[in-house]
Amino acid sequence: MLVKGNEILLKAHKEGYGVGAFNFVNFEMLNAIFEAGNEENSPLFIQTSEGAIKYMGIDMAVGMVKTMCERYPHIPVALHLDHGTTFESCEKAVKAGFTSVMIDASHHAFEENLELTSKVVKMAHNAGVSVEAELGRLMGIEDNISVDEKDAVLVNPKEAEQFVKESQVDYLAPAIGTSHGAFKFKGEPKLDFERLQEVKRLTNIPLVLHGASAIPDNVRKSYLDAGGDLKGSKGVPFEFLQESVKGGINKVNTDTDLRIAFIAEVRKVANEDKSQFDLRKFFSPAQLALKNVVKERMKLLGSANKI
């Protein structure tokens, strides 16, 4: 059943576990995510970006999610707009049936971010929709979001406290050292867990970890074995994800891992049978690989068996 984002995350916040927020761009990805939720008895945070909405069409995206909710009525599901860049984009998502939206004004100055977030919160709350915002800036590239290393800034905990109090946002994504994409760290992975814990203490709301793909060894191997190139890639270690949840993270965004796992299987089929053109032969193993990544993440973060 489709529910407000806060309905899922407040429970995670109170009970101290994390919920994976999984991006989709087509039916195959969505189907695999729902199958994983069903098999692991986990609530689902389904999200899609402005770029993916442009690709699928917003009515199609919402329609597919609603259809899957009818197939699995026992699973609490939030449909979330990831990285909404404007008020209009968030409003469009709310009107289309999303139950959670993110307004990402983190590239603006604090006061501008606060003003725009507050405007979105008022609009969304009037419609019964939850809102996420971001403070600090994550390095990396995701859809139309691109931030250089010199522009990446970690969150200020006191500013986070003020921001949450004044905006009344439902959950916050604090920048603590992760980055978008497959190339998250130049040296050894490092996240500012002390900063995270202070933000949690001062805000006392669900927190979100962006740039949280791990690029697990088995997924990396499958991609490389199929002829892919991930030179220099480095994800967030599993133990860091677990430590983040202990420090107050309740929503863990995951996109890159899903893409890599899916495409690895498509490449594999293409390499092994160059005469193959039955799409089902490509997408069936790709869905299974993606589902396994999602199931593993649900168990790691603690959302398995939380329905």
From Swiss-Prot:
SUPFAM superfamilies: Aldolase (SSF51569)
Molecular functions (GO terms): fructose-bisphosphate aldolase activity; zinc ion binding
Pathway of action: Carbohydrate degradation; glycolysis; D-glyceraldehyde 3-phosphate and glycerone phosphate from D-glucose: step 4/4
E.C. number(s) listed in UniProt: 4.1.2.13
InterPro entries listed in its UniProt record: Aldolase_TIM, Class_II_FBP_aldolase, FBA_II, Fruc_bis_ald_class-2
Free-text comment on the cofactor: Binds 2 Zn(2+) ions per subunit. One is catalytic and the other provides a structural contribution.
Amino acids binding Zn(2+) 1: H83, H180, H210
GO biological process, one term: fructose 1,6-bisphosphate metabolic process
Swiss-Prot/TrEMBL cofactor(s): Zn(2+)
UniProt entry tagged with the keyword Nucleotidyltransferase: no
Assembly mode: Homodimer.
General function of this protein: Catalyzes the aldol condensation of dihydroxyacetone phosphate (DHAP or glycerone-phosphate) with glyceraldehyde 3-phosphate (G3P) to form fructose 1,6-bisphosphate (FBP) in gluconeogenesis and the reverse reaction in glycolysis.
Protein name: Fructose-bisphosphate aldolase
Organism per entry: Helicobacter pylori (strain ATCC 700392 / 26695) (Campylobacter pylori)
Gene transcribed to yield this protein: fba
